[in-house]
Design a protein with these regions (language model features):
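Mobile cap/lid helix-loop segments that border enzyme active or cofactor-binding sites
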Residues: 1-75
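Short alpha-helical scaffolding segments that buttress acidic/His motifs in well-ordered protein cores
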Residues: 48-52, 62-69, 82-88, 117-118, ...
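Conserved alpha-helical segments that form or flank metal/cofactor-binding pockets of metalloenzymes
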Residues: 58-60, 87-107, 111
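Extended, structured, electrostatic nucleic-acid-contact surfaces
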Residues: 65, 144-151
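C-terminal end-helix/capping segment
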Residues: 103-113, 117, 178-185
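A contiguous pocket-lining binding segment that forms or flanks enzyme active sites
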Residues: 107-135
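Alpha-helical transmembrane segments and membrane-interface helix-loop junctions
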Residues: 143-144, 185
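Transmembrane-helix boundary/entry motifs in multi-pass membrane transporters
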Residues: 157-158
Length: 185
């Protein structure tokens, strides 16, 4: 698939683009174990991050939101990756799926759990993870019914339901951007 936006040359970025590039390539995503490459061999950004450079102010806000979800949220790593992979399955987002299957495996998701998530199946999970999975599927349909709201707010708390809702919206936005800009994995 030919991308609609060519990779931005890291050596030819405007100041606002350079600042955003550094926040992505040198921020928390670049620290610790790397489960997927943030950059191509030529140093340009991969995935949704290249398109962020089209509008650095908005891209910067998205980058900050994504970093907050990934590194400062209350969801466990497993629960977060369950939700992200269900979003990837819903939107059939190859890049999100590829990137987050590796992160999910590193967070302890088993091959059987990853296969269920690939198929968009939330039933492989129990307890709080089951609540997160079921709530994610409902959120992807556009709402959370009263019964699941009650269960989720009691099990994981209203603040974590807020976080989950934000995560689903953020990764759905990325999936749409990846599709519109024809970003290959």
């Amino acid at each position: 698939m030919q991308g609609r936006v060519q990779p931005f040359d890291p050596g030819a970025l405007a100041p606002a683009q350079r600042e955003l590039f550094e926040a992505i390539a040198g921020g928390p995503r670049a620290q610790g174990p790397q489960h997927f490459a943030l950059t191509r061999p030529d140093g340009s950004l991969r995935g949704p991050f290249n398109a962020f450079l089209l509008a650095p102010e908005l891209g910067g806000a998205l980058q900050s939101l994504g970093a907050a979800i990934r590194y400062r949220g209350a969801l466990t790593a497993r629960a977060r990756e369950i939700a992200i992979l269900l979003v990837a399955a819903h939107w059939d987002s190859e890049f999100e799926r590829e990137a987050h299957q590796a992160v999910g495996a590193a967070s302890g998701l088993t091959p059987d759990e990853l296969a269920a998530l690939h198929d968009g199946d939330p039933t492989a999970f129990a307890g709080d993870e089951g609540v997160v999975a079921t709530a994610t599927v409902q959120l992807l349909a556009g709402d959370l019914d009263d019964e699941l709201w009650r269960v989720a707010s009691e099990a994981i708390g209203a603040e974590v339901v807020f976080e989950l809702t934000t995560l689903v919206g953020y990764y759905s936005t990325l999936a749409l951007q990846l599709r519109v800009f024809r970003v290959a994995p």
